[in-house]
A protein has these predicted regions:
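Short polar/charged helix/loop
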Residues: 1-140
């Protein structure tokens, strides 16, 4: 995918030597967090490796759960666990996939890269930003 290499280079990242690998048995179960771009991938991992199901999300799904939940947990791992509990109590939305740029022109790759930048920035904020004093103090 020369388009992906070009768009990454425009963002200062060299992926020219990157080689995709298949997910092997045990990889997802050993991970602290598995982020997928599509719900079908998340669902396949949950079926194939049930121990990983609570730590496997689409990128957009996890961001939504973290932002909507207002979690005051102190650590990223605790926030992820709370998001998994919220998912069990709620719904999975079909519109939480990231589009696959394969076959798109270069501008399509750029658009998806910009979308990923936004979602990843939101994820980092939701996982690592300090807890607002009003949430963490117990005061209402």
């Amino acid at each position: 995918m020369p388009e992906a290499v070009e768009v990454a280079a425009e963002r200062g990242v060299d992926i020219s030597g990157h080689v995709a690998t298949r997910l092997r048995p045990g990889m997802a179960s050993a991970a602290d967090l598995v982020l997928c771009m599509a719900g079908e991938h998340r669902d396949l991992i949950a079926r194939e490796e049930p121990p990983a199901a609570g730590r496997t999300f689409t990128l957009k799904e996890l961001v939504r759960l973290l932002e909507d939940g207002g979690h005051a947990e102190a650590t990223p791992a605790a926030r992820i666990a709370a998001a998994a509990r919220d998912r069990e109590a709620g719904t999975v939305r079909p519109d939480e996939d990231v589009a696959d740029p394969l076959g798109l022109p270069l501008d399509g790759y750029r658009a998806i890269a910009a979308e990923l930048d936004d979602w990843i920035a939101r994820l980092v904020s939701a996982l690592w930003d300090p807890i607002p004093a009003a949430l963490g103090s117990g005061d209402t």
